[in-house]
């Protein structure tokens, strides 16, 4: 089982992920991305889904038109783990060329 990050490790990880923030009411991190249109948002989600499936670690997300809200946590560990940080980095890499707002 993967270990939950300590508070110091979580803060350090978030410092390296400036577009992500902690959810105040949960042991999770979140990012909201806005794309130019629904097609671009859905394409982003499809790319993330392939990476998530490969790593067997899946985001919680919500899509409304051009906006995608992503939440990452490791339920088995009861909070944020290295798996969430790794997936957040992958999400940032997928999003970067799409220039989300």
Swiss-Prot record:
**Which reactions are catalysed by this chain?**
(4aS,6R)-4a-hydroxy-L-erythro-5,6,7,8-tetrahydrobiopterin = (6R)-L-erythro-6,7-dihydrobiopterin + H2O
EC top class, in one word? Answer: lyase
The record's GO molecular-function terms, alphabetically, read: 4-alpha-hydroxytetrahydrobiopterin dehydratase activity
Q: Which UniProt keywords apply?
A: Lyase
- Transmembrane ranges, per UniProt, are none
Which Pfam family, any one of them, does this sequence belong to? Pterin_4a
GO BP terms: namely:
tetrahydrobiopterin biosynthetic process
Q: What is its EC number?
A: 4.2.1.96
| Family under the similarity heading | Belongs to the pterin-4-alpha-carbinolamine dehydratase family.
The protein depicted here goes by the name: Putative pterin-4-alpha-carbinolamine dehydratase
């Amino acid at each position: 089982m993967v270990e939950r990050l300590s508070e110091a490790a979580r803060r350090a990880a978030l410092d390296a992920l400036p577009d992500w923030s902690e959810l105040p009411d949960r042991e999770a991190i979140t990012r909201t991305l806005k794309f130019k249109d629904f097609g671009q948002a859905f394409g982003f989600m499809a790319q993330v889904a392939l990476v998530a499936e490969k790593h067997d670690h899946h985001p919680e997300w919500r899509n409304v038109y051009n906006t995608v809200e992503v939440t990452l946590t490791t339920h088995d560990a009861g909070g944020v783990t290295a798996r969430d940080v790794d997936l957040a980095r992958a999400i940032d890499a997928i999003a970067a060329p799409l220039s989300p707002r």
